[in-house]
């Protein structure tokens, strides 16, 4: 059997391009012979898309691991890589593996020493990536292959000794705000005055959730697009049946979304914040009906990324800050309520932001489309992992109508 090998690419786009162009076919790999893989591919074709790059990779003998994939799928792919009986020996990955993920890899191939298109590794990151091999007590030494172009840097191990710095340094405005030393920062005082709030209010309502640079940026953009936002909310309030797409687009202008594919991306966000849950496949198919020239792989990846992390962790959080700005300015309560009812409430329900038990399942890797069905069987009377495990052990035989991804995660929890 081949030694396990990581193949590193800096971006998901680069991974998809490699998968599309790869002509390697491992004749010894028969997906139908592996019940887990057979079920996963069948589910992925229905839930995501038959042309999803992850399916193509599996058919060509590759596993894939990157941060845009839902957690449960990442866990499944990594488990297959570390299992010698799966016959998968090649895992394509991004810098997610720099975040402490251990594998059974003996080799790593570094195709480009970058975190993204323009963020070149320093020596610490480079050797951290090299150190992903030779772990899990499988190999005494790992082997790294660096595909170096004339423009790529030469790394010296002696330069990899780097002190760990906190994101908030002694010179940070956020640190000064936290300790009350803000008088030397007129830009912060200006924000307090614009919002007509005290330092104590800022510290309790804002500082714990947002960096000052984010607050300042969003506040400036809020003023820039305020009239458009209030106008759209007024129209939404008058006509509850009106599409919220224009509301999404004004909000994304304020949040600073890039112009490239702006209409396409906001269309996807709108679909992913409907009142009812849609599969990735449904969102992708509908999007392609309206944007016929869009790249299929880009639409799939964008939908997954927005659904898995962006809407919950960035979009909702920043829209909530805009709502706070509106309250500070004493905008009509009916318009603030409209923002919540037409958009924020949908996100809270769909992404389980107000349901601790469902959120726990999601954070453990359970696929979101299965969570409501699981709760129907086990109930929601648990607040710890131990209580959840006990309920899952008792109810596991009844959990038939869930995806292979969730079954895999649950089996790991109760084994």
Residue ranges and their predicted role:
Residues 109-110:
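Short hydrophobic alpha-helical runs that function as membrane-insertion/retention elements
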Residues 164-192:
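C-terminal or mid-to-C-terminal helical accessory/interaction module adjacent to the motor/catalytic core
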Residues 114-116, 122-165:
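Conserved segment of the helicase C-terminal RecA-like domain
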Residues 2-90, 105, 115-133, 146, ...:
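Conserved C-terminal RecA-like helicase domain
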Residues 91-97:
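Ser/Thr-glycine-rich phosphate-binding loops at phosphate-binding pockets of nucleotides
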Residues 183-415:
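C-terminal accessory/interaction regions of large nucleic acid-associated machines
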